[in-house]
Amino acid sequence: MGERGPLGVQGLDDLPADIGPWLEGFVQQLALVIGDGLDGVYLHGSLATGDFVRGSSDVDLLLATREPLTAAQRVALRDLLLERSTPRLPIEISSLSRAERRPWRHPCPFDWHFSEAWRDRMAASRALGTEPAQPATDPDLAAHVTMLHARGRTLLGLPADEAFPPVPRTDFLASVLAPDVAACLATLRDAPAYGVLNLCRLGMYARTGRLGSKREGALWALAEARAPLPALTRRALSAYDAGDEDERRGWDAAELAACARQWTDELKDLSAPGG
């Protein structure tokens, strides 16, 4: 992971042959937009862990800047993301200034965000010459930064551990654990394969302290006989590998409810002090 591109982009050499050059070019474009105010660009998520599935996974990035983005930079980033993020390679990126990164707070404040879920609002804002209102904080950033430290990559700029402070375990767990069985079940119904695999990943972390990908979590749960419903977990893994992670049809409601109940109880016990 040490090869560098013309602007010092690194961490690309073991990525899929078509994605590495594409990502290098995109990071270079980010650097040109931010200029001297750039602290770094960081990759986390499935592309960093080697479990990226085309048509299902996002390219997950964090952008670190010295100061908040200017109005011109926001416009340039919006236009860049509307052009470069595609259904084949969807980008999710959050930009955080130094004041938003340190001291650490949860939920974490951020400066700017783009994902495909924001595409329509961003496109509408471009047409109107306005900027869409975004939340001031994002609780998911505790999970993103934790995964960056554990399994992510510095693509450009400061090392990740210099750009981002460590995230307390309690904040990470608060960002990823459903508050109750009903909330967990709602996630499973909305995205069954994603929800089942994510529960396996959280179970692996809670029991072993290791942060893995969704695929790694499922394989651990099956190998250690920790999956409440092994057949359900295997189906979720197959759906994930096939790029069918968001398919909602044909899942047994009773099995999803049992999965939500058993994982919620176990994770609640494991995340408690001394668990």
Over which residues does each language-model region extend?
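Conserved NTP/Mg2+-binding pocket subregion across the NTase superfamily
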Residues: 2-12, 79-187, 196
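Glycine- and acidic
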Residues: 7-13, 63, 242-247
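Conserved nucleotidyltransferase catalytic core and NTase-mimicking acidic/glycine-rich helix/loop elements
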Residues: 132-275
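Short, solvent-exposed loop/turn segments at secondary-structure junctions
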Residues: 48, 100-101, 201-204
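Charged catalytic carboxylate motif
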Residues: 22-25, 76, 198, 259
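Catalytic metal-binding acidic patch
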Residues: 41-79, 90-97
